């Protein structure tokens, strides 16, 4: 964009000169000089018709003498060329600053600096906002980073090259005025201006003050700059040098001011109260009597949304005005409702936001008075409008209003956190908002807004707010179920608040009420009643009360003793209510005879609770009480669970071992009960089982762990209602059907794959049908006979005919296209989807029990069995998108297992660990790493790759655990490791991979890195090991250089053996052919050895040099062999 602000005149020049200059400027042609060829905003060249005398006079001035092309550093043109048309980067600006600051030639530096500033200052007057901002950022950086620049010279350049007429006429003067303001603002931020020299202050503020009478956007920009600059000046300097310059435009009645000039006046008052006190400003605005509505009208009029600072200064003025001014503001806002202009709405909301952030503690009640019902309605309506307005093509004013509403919400939260001191005022303001909109978060964009306000309340206020929501449950209209549920959710939030954890008595009272509301029908007086007399709240929200009660009962429970104590109090209260007349008829789910019979045992348990020292007794007590409580709910568990727990408790607490039933131990029944409880819906069951199981795990046996592991057997469905025999027979039938389906088309797998992809044509499909019919017609003994495809029906008896008929029917049915109904039948039904979801959640919860086992009993058998099971679960879920939650849970537990050490007993054999390693490594498929490098990988790459990665990590973990106590080479796992390594080296296809040994190197706990490196180096044999395996070994050793260096420092003997093997390998390479890749990897390893391997490194370098000519010769021979032979045509000769 071309800039049209190149003026040969300055302020104060005669009018005739200005007129002539403008005419010349209009006639001037845009020609580029060598120096000005790369400016961001192109500068017009001087008119050729300018008088020679004027030219000579201007060339003799000092400022223009510095801009001669011959004196300018030519490197600056390169920098400007890079800047043009590219985004501003730190590297660009640093290159320009370095050029201006580090030039040792003073004359050249001065000329270059002047030229740079001239170009950039002219660019600030461009008719393009992006160009102006870019040039201003460069000027700001240069003035702050180059100390040799004089601010007065910048001002002179500004007045000369970006002059503005005394009367701003036309677009050129307006653009030049913007450039002057921007450049002046850059000077205000320089270290030189920070010294506050009177001469510089006067010069800069003369430029700023001159724009207070310009166009509206210039006055707005100038006002913002002035308000910021006041904070940099001492009061004395401002009063003597700046205030006289501003008074002509500011010292006027309110009727003579605009919003921006009034804003500058408020900024002077707020910054320099000693210069312009409150009485002085009031007298200036209203010579007779203050009329605050005139001030408010000034800010509300117009359609422009001003900058945030304008509203912040008005808010500070209101706060300082005390009760009268805030009351006048509140009345004015209410009287203007409803506001129609977005600018007026923005003003009201922005000012209120800043009032909330700046009021004084003694004015809390005044702030509360501002939030009248009318004001609250206006604020929440605007917040709701911007939240639910999802339109993309919005007006700029709507976008600004949306940001302002966001700021208001944040200001209110900050006010609660930092400003409000009186807790009653916090609660009062929150209740005002809730009275208008009960579901406050539905109209507020800030996430968890209501929760943030509630978190700032004290314990007493939380109790009051809880009562407010509780009373709302009965005062709402009968049909308003949504609001009642919301109130219950808020009550749950308050009930589980961390501040109320110490108020046990109040919390127990609320839990008792929720228990009553969840299990009984309640009337309008909150008393148990018959179903016919139940209130609307009881009919609509009893189920939700039940959920909240059970969830809150276990919230942040301190442990098993605390849980038992809480259940004792709760069950005692429930038992008391059940003892009332006709209590059974008032229950939402009346108890059956079996539960009433078992309830007598519960009453006995309440009379004689277990001691805290008796962990098993308390565990059973918690289980029995909680299950009996859950049996009274609408969705109870099976009554057999309670009966089994009562019998188990009796057996577990028997002192005589002879009376214990050896066939079925109480631990087995208890484990089954825990698993059955995990099947129940409701997150509280998972939390409850974890609480109880944490205390019981040390008392369980390995057989109980196997019960949990059986749930995670991915080949069986633990929720299946069929018996094992039925499942096996079903599996056999499925296998037979699959074999039967695949027998007809197994001859041509490629055609089948094409058919699956929808690429088979009708002809191939017909051939398949024909072959299927032929197979159906042949006799058992004629399968290989070529003539068996024909049948003589005269020789066919009735039995054989029925067989052929059935075979033909199966053949045609097999290839019959499936209808839409048949395809829909193949999709899982709703019940099947629910069952699969329940099974998924059940298995995830079962993983919690496994985590408790490895935490409480990290024995060898426990860790190995859990590790194998969890890895199998992960492997099964890795590629199944429907099991991703189970995959993540199993992977999370797998990481925890690998972080724990196995606790071995004294002289305990590590043979099970070796078996686990062999079982783990045999689980993978044989694969070729050479095929993988050549791109011949299977289709499901990522899932298999992830499985192999975690298998290798498990392998490294087991190896380190098997050799944790002694020297690795003397451990039982070392021979197995060497055997694995030999198999990997010898075989092309192997279950092991390079990553398996890499995982061993990366295992921080294992001490066998040094001897393993020696074994790997021993396989660097040109005669015995393939080149691909040698390259893999070299790659591994080169990548683990630092780890090897540390390992060899602690093991000197292994270090010497390793050097010996490497030296042997180097000697082999001198006589045997090798690849360049091999040599490069070997050089990398030798480079890590320093001076001691210098000789070996030189040997390899010679081998590498000899290899280059041989490669060229081989390449030439290969190219020659590939050339086609020219055979002469004998006939032509």
From Swiss-Prot:
Residues 725-735, 744-762 have a biased composition (Acidic residues). Residues 20-35, 50-60 have a biased composition (Basic and acidic residues). Disruption phenotype: Reduced rRNA transcription which results in larval reduced growth. RNAi-mediated knockdown in the fat body results in the mislocalization of nclb from the nucleolus to the nucleoplasm. GO terms for cellular component: cytoplasm; nucleolus. It comes from the Eukaryota. Its main location: cytoplasm. It holds the Pfam family DNA_pol_phi. Residues 1-62, 718-764, 924-943, 1111-1133 are annotated as: Disordered. SUPFAM superfamilies: ARM repeat (SSF48371). The keyword Nucleus applies. InterPro entries: ARM-type_fold (IPR016024), DNA_pol_V/MYBBP1A (IPR007015). Keywords: Cytoplasm, Nucleus, Ribosome biogenesis. Has a role in rRNA biogenesis, cell proliferation and tissue growth by contributing to the localization of nclb to the nucleolus. Belongs to the MYBBP1A family. Interacts with nclb. This is Myb-binding protein 1A. It comes from Drosophila melanogaster.
